Amino acid sequence: LRLLILMLFIITSAVTQAQTYEAGLVLGGTNFVGDVGSSSFTNPSDYAKKDKFSYGAIFKWNRSPRHAFRFSIIQHRTFGYDHLSESIGRQKRGYEFKNSLTEFSVGLEFNFWEWNLHDFKRPQFVPYVSTGLNFFIADHLGPNEPEKELVKIDENYNFAIPLIFGIKGAVSERFVIALEFGARYAFTDNLDGSNPQESIEIDEIVSFGNQNMNDWYIFGGVTLTYTFGRKPCYCKF
């Protein structure tokens, strides 16, 4: 929560008089795809039951009607339960984990057609795609065999590549709402505790699952942003 407040303070105090900016909040759910739990890319019913919402703050710098720089901090809360898996083998194994990822993201957002916040003579709805680079801090997990639970043994500092699709619309002269779905390919195979020896050599802990594939985490949610800055004179990049 402190990170979100700090980010909102920085981006709202950095206003210049040349471009149009957006700053706001993010709320949704984060699904995990790896070696523990369900392999479904979306599982909204589970998040409603487990109350594992993800939240964060986002800032966009609209550099032209077709693209923007975007920066975000999101606290992803995810989990996996083998008994919810479609795999009989996983159901019999019975592992479970919970993990929390603090994600710092920088990227580019491309609009499918021109997005002009200052033109309200026509409906302002546009689909978009975004990618970039994420850095995250998560728990480095390992198995606690008697309890069949994967628990924290260290910190996991790593990167991920996001691919995000969304649609956004201006609901007033100052507010924009967006729905987006984004998959993150992580540069680690241990968000679920299946490969604890990835960065730590522990003789008594054995890795399991597919060691040739890294983990994914998938976020789906809504953003609400407030726009500020005068009507822009767009640059050439």
PLM features: residue spans?
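Short glycine/proline- and aromatic-enriched beta-strand/turn motifs that initiate or cap beta-hairpins
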Residues: 17-60, 140, 219-231, 237
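Outer-envelope beta-barrel architecture signal
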Residues: 19-23, 65-69, 100-102, 123-127, ...
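Residues on the lipid-exposed face of transmembrane beta-strands in outer-membrane beta-barrel proteins
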Residues: 25-29, 57-61, 106-110, 131-135, ...
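Outer-membrane beta-barrel translocator domains and adjoining extracellular loop/strand segments
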Residues: 35-41, 81-88, 120-122, 140-148, ...
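Gram-negative (and chloroplast) outer-membrane scaffold detector with strong preference
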Residues: 61, 65-144, 228
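Predominantly the C-terminal beta-signal and adjacent terminal strand-loop region
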Residues: 171-237
